[in-house]
């Protein structure tokens, strides 16, 4: 697929930054490209610790929320948590439950069933809690859009607290965007208007932790015990794909470090079941190995199983549960592969191929993997993609977007066709009647205003850098940039006029490109590209330009530099 190459052009005195912080000028440029301008921001990025995290008291309603909770705890009232079935909801629920238990609360929790309940708090779950004698409901990773549901709970005389991080819902009134929030007793969400909290990109678990931190302060609990929540916040922050900037970066760095010494039996058992070494866990392992196992419970079974794993104190029980989670994830992978292929074929062989916004209906597909498949479709065609499946009542869909297309806003414009919707600029969830799927698809495509430039993937190059400049010392410095993820992507470099000396497709599945390239100054380097997927390979003797990331390769005791090809084109 053709892509646009763009070089960041942000200006700064890179030499001075390098001298002040003891880093290479290339590092200084990368950091500036991540939007950091002041010395304070750069220091937080490179050296931030838990002491640099923002005060939870800055969150609107956070103190009010804890005042309500402590009053309920002292009065012996029942508190009920309603979470979510994804990794963020799982970790958020675990944090709230452990924290409230530590404060002496009579607390229980429920996670909505993805198939039966759908996303978030609903009347069925409210009735269930009410009939069990619940006085107070507290949500996590959901609730900000549950206006009617929370009104229903209030009419039953219940106290309701919302902790959430999702975008604030809105209506268009006379062309103006009007935000609306539920009439809860307290709402803790950094995205709220008039919330003075300086960072609005926390995940749900991050918001839940802020509440528990204040609760520990107010109840006089041992603050060192808060450390046991570190890895849960890190897992949720990585798994929910929020920006790894500001304090999210601290959360992940500290959480990964603490993971090596975690006392959480369930996490240890899951790491063991995934055949990983606990002292070598990176953000990659969380995002692509451990996280999917936790998520698989909410997709194919009940997310309660994952929470019970994270709460157990029995190692034998933990190992049993961890193996069950891994087995579920294998099943989830098989389903995903099958229906992703069907979705791609449907786009390629029908009128959908001409749409700018892809809406694919897979009636027989398990609704829990719709989001993953939407991501695959987006990756294949570079179009905003929504995969819709048949549900218990009508249809449900999950969408994944591209930069330049705010999926939540665009879906909101079609709100009259939907029964329920919510999400972010880059992802959304919907429910609608099956009969309205085609009308919804047409409305999205009629409303869209994406240019060809938006519909062409862009590769952003941090620094045009000759391969001759790269050495192991520089690559070692790049470790200071970790953890990588959304908002802090792995740095990308580019070089030109590289002569292809060798070029071959290797690997068991013949999907890896291995090249030997010669620079203009005669330096020979090894370059490799994974997941070829039928792409063209460069011809020997021709000159290419290459977008790359340099890595250290260790094999049979030999340490060498290997260039990972992100993209290439003939000169």
Where do the protein language model's features map onto the residues?
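Catalytic domains of riboflavin
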Residues: 1-4, 480-482
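A short acidic, often aromatic-flanked loop/helix-cap motif at beta-alpha or helix-coil junctions
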Residues: 12-14, 116, 193-196, 468-470, ...
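Mid-to-C-terminal polyanion-binding domains and interfaces
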Residues: 71-75, 317-323, 327-361, 413-571
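Active-site cavity-forming subdomains of large catalytic enzyme subunits
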Residues: 127-205, 209-218, 228, 245
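A short acidic, amphipathic alpha-helical/loop segment
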Residues: 148-152, 358, 373, 477
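Short alpha-helical basic/polar micro-motif
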Residues: 206, 371, 375, 546
């Amino acid at each position: 697929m053709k892509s646009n190459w763009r070089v960041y052009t942000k200006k700064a005195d890179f030499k001075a930054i390098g001298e002040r912080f003891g880093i290479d000028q290339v590092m200084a440029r990368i950091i500036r490209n991540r939007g950091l301008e002041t010395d304070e921001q750069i220091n937080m990025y490179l050296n931030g610790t838990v002491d640099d995290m923002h005060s939870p008291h800055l969150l609107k309603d956070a103190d009010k929320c804890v005042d309500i909770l402590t009053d309920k705890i002292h009065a012996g009232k029942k508190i009920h948590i309603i979470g979510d079935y994804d990794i963020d909801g799982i970790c958020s629920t675990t944090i709230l439950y452990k924290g409230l238990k530590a404060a002496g609360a009579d607390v229980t929790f429920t996670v909505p069933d993805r198939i039966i309940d759908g996303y978030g708090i609903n009347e069925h779950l409210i009735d269930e809690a009410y009939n069990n004698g619940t006085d107070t409901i507290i949500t996590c990773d959901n609730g900000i859009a549950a206006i009617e549901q929370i009104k229903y709970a209030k009419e039953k005389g219940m106290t309701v607290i919302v902790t959430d991080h999702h975008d604030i819902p809105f209506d268009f009134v006379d062309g103006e965007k009007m935000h609306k929030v539920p009439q809860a007793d307290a709402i803790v969400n950094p995205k709220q208007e008039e919330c003075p909290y300086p960072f609005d990109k926390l995940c749900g678990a991050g918001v839940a932790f802020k509440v528990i931190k204040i609760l520990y302060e107010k109840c006089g609990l041992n603050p060192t015990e808060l450390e046991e929540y570190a890895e849960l916040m890190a897992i949720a922050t990585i798994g929910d794909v929020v920006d790894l900037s500001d304090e999210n970066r601290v959360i992940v760095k500290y959480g990964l470090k603490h993971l090596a010494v975690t006392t959480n039996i369930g996490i240890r058992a899951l790491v063991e079941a995934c055949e990983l070494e606990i002292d070598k866990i990176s953000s990659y392992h969380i995002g692509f190995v451990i996280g999917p196992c936790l998520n698989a419970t909410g997709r194919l079974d009940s997310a309660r199983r994952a929470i019970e794993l994270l709460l157990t104190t029995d190692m034998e029980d933990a190992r049993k549960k961890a193996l069950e989670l891994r087995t579920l994830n294998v099943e989830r992978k098989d389903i995903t592969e099958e229906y992703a292929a069907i979705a791609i074929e449907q786009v390629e062989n029908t009128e959908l191929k001409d749409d700018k916004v892809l809406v694919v209906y897979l009636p027989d597909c398990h609704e829990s993997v719709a989001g993953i498949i939407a991501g695959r479709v987006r990756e294949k065609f570079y179009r905003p993609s929504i995969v819709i499946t048949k549900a218990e009542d009508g249809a449900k869909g999950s969408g994944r977007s591209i930069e330049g297309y705010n999926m939540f806003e665009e879906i909101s414009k079609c709100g009259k066709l939907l029964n329920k919707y919510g999400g972010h600029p880059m992802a959304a969830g919907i429910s609608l009647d099956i009969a309205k799927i085609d009308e919804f698809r047409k409305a999205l495509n009629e409303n869209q205003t994406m240019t060809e430039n938006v519909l062409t993937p862009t590769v952003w190059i941090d620094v045009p850098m000759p391969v001759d400049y790269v050495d192991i010392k520089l690559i070692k410095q790049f470790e200071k940039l970790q953890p990588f993820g959304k908002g802090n992507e792995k740095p990308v470099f580019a070089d030109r006029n590289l002569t292809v000396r060798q070029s071959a497709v290797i690997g068991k599945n013949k999907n890896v490109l291995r090249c030997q390239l010669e620079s203009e100054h005669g330096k020979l380097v090894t370059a490799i590209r994974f997941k070829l997927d039928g792409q063209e390979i460069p011809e020997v003797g021709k000159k290419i330009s290459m977008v790359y990331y340099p890595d250290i390769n260790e094999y049979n005791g030999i340490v060498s530099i290997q260039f990972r090809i992100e993209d290439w084109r003939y000169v």
